[in-house]
Amino acid sequence: WRTLSSPAAGRKKMATINMLEETANYLLNHCFVLGGVEDQRAKYLYVQDHLDEVRAVFAPLGYSVLLYPAPLQAAALVNGHEGSQARLLKYESILLLVLRLLYLQKRESLAANADEVLVTVEEVQTELQKMNLPRRLDQKTLENLMRTLRRYNLARPVGRLSGLDSRIEVFPTVLLALPDADLADAAAESARTRTELGLYERPEGADTEAGEGEA
């Protein structure tokens, strides 16, 4: 006699296939998926529980899927081919490095199980001023830069960035923004981040428009 699968089993299989497609597409569009963010948690858990299947989807394309357990709780889609990585504009890179630095500083003072790292626009502007940049980032420019970082699941604004006390949630994925990060040594990574920021410093009066050039 031929063995027939139950409708319930068929629905479960279809749901699994759909989740694989949904998660794979999400990684392609956003590079990271986070277990600590409520609307991404199901996708992160799917990658965690079906890592081999997810990797099998991307392997023929030359991508690797890396899983970072707690405390990071992140899955990353990585392509090592030259020219295939996401390219950030100069001020996007600067903002990313500033948020990375602030994340490292804040994380040291938070409880190990803290889910959120929040920084204020004032803290961001203070770090930017140290770099002698040619202009202060206004609200519109900052919000435009944040759209890119949000797309790649690096950070997101908490509401409108309308004042110095407005907040930005910084995701642990900023730690993975620099290659070969030593995730166990926050002090070393802070120093490294400041070194990277130093490459963008400009003397007073330099004429550079925000957002020009690539990182």
Language-model features, listed with the residues they occupy:
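Short acidic, hydrophobic short linear motifs in intrinsically disordered regions
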Residues: 34-42, 109-128
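A short, conserved structural fragment
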Residues: 61-67, 150-161
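Eukaryotic partner-binding/assembly regions in large regulatory complexes
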Residues: 1-81
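Short alpha-helical segments that sit at the start of domains
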Residues: 79-115
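Accessory beta->alpha helical hairpin/"wing" motif in late/C-terminal subdomains of nucleic-acid enzymes
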Residues: 75-77, 156-181
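Long, low-complexity, intrinsically disordered segments
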Residues: 206-215
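Short, amphipathic alpha-helical interaction segments positioned at domain boundaries
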Residues: 87, 171-207
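Short amphipathic alpha-helical interaction segments
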Residues: 49-53, 135-151
